[in-house]
Amino acid sequence: RAKKTMKRSALMYCCRSGKRSGNLRRTIEVARKLSDSFNVTVLLGDAIPSRIEFPDNVKTVLLPSLGIDPDTNVFDISRSQELRDLIIARRNVLIREFERLKPRVVAIEDFPFRQHALRAEVIPLIERARNGVYGDALVVGMTDGILADDAERDDSYRDQTAQLLDKYFDMVIVQSDPVFARIEEFFQPQNVMQVPVYHTGFVSSESGVQPADPTIVPDTVLVSAGDGDHGGPLYRAAVEAHKILGSTLLLPMKIVTGERLPEDEWQDLVAKADGSPDLTVERTVPDISAALTAARWSVSQCEYITAVHTMQTRTPSLFVPSGNEGDRHAQIVRAQRLVYWGAGRLLLPQHLNGASLANEIHELMRFQPRRMHFDLNGAVNAANLITQAALHKDLTADIAHPASDDKRPR
């Protein structure tokens, strides 16, 4: 007789946004590792950029797009009814998928830390996960560790977030090395939370450091700002800096703007770069990690993915955080800590112009980064932790409620 195999449990992974490729790349790496133990379905809040692919064994479901940034909760008041209808539609998709999958684990990115606006769609899902109809699912919150400036939050916001975590979540996973950043530095409710919090390390690419992009010439300065939605000031300053530096030395520079740089800014940048043989401007590259590996120096806003790559490769890096309110705090904190650990230099956004950037790049060319020893196995560690926690929850439930015919999905 053939040996009977146990059906693998389902896992629902709710990704906060499909718009930002850096967030998606982290989601992909964690989902890839979770798929070793679970049948993983990722629920996406927005469409996936064309150049990003999920593993074949990870299913994806697209929610109706709200057309707003959940980080800022900014929306046109005239769209209030439309947004209410969209939230109901998204909630219905989440519930439908939950009923279909009967997941053993529900993992949710960033709620309730950054996504109070999405409470109406997320809470009904969590309540179903906890009501025991299909067994008490493990509910996991996930965040990258450096939150918005907690000083700008009032006590009620922080306390409400902590209450939601204690009421609905079994555990919180922080995708950071605790030596680098701990969540309690940025999130300080009045009462101590009861939900367990685990810092699992930074999430890096499964294959480690990517091979160098062969299209990038030696001794190149690579300028990037994630998807580019707030990269315009950095890119314009980079063009001016290249012109200033070009008067005394030959310095190849490649600017990768990202898909979300507004079209008018893109066209203006291309026009300004025209006629400079050592300056190239591109919307995207096949693999930003490969481009960073090939570059001699990196100038970036210190997004999560760029910071992790700096830790991996020790590429001399200049960090110029975004002036955008939503991104600035996390990028500045991340950059300051990398500078402290000897990874690079920092130019604050209020000091950014062509001359200051040229001076910092010139200093960067003489900079020698130090080796760092942070945990970069965040995807593996998180997947192992979730797998063990789900198993423990199963065993605890079996002991508390023994039954000859366990109806829970396996």
What are these regions (language model features)?
Residues 14-28, 231-233:
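A short, glycine/small-residue-rich beta-strand->loop->alpha-helix junction that serves as a flexible
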Residues 7-15, 33-85, 89-91, 96, ...:
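Conserved nucleotide-sugar phosphate-binding/catalytic loop shared by glycosyltransferases and other
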Residues 312-363:
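Nucleotide-sugar donor-binding patch of glycosyltransferase catalytic domains
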Residues 143-232, 258-263:
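A nucleotide-sugar donor-handling region in carbohydrate enzymes
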Residues 31, 187-188, 202-297, 332, ...:
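Donor-nucleotide binding loops and adjacent catalytic segments primarily
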Residues 359-410:
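C-terminal amphipathic helix plus adjacent low-complexity
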Residues 46, 287-333:
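A donor-sugar binding/catalytic signature common to diverse glycosyltransferases
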Residues 95-166:
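Conserved nucleotide-sugar donor-interacting segment of glycosyltransferase catalytic cores
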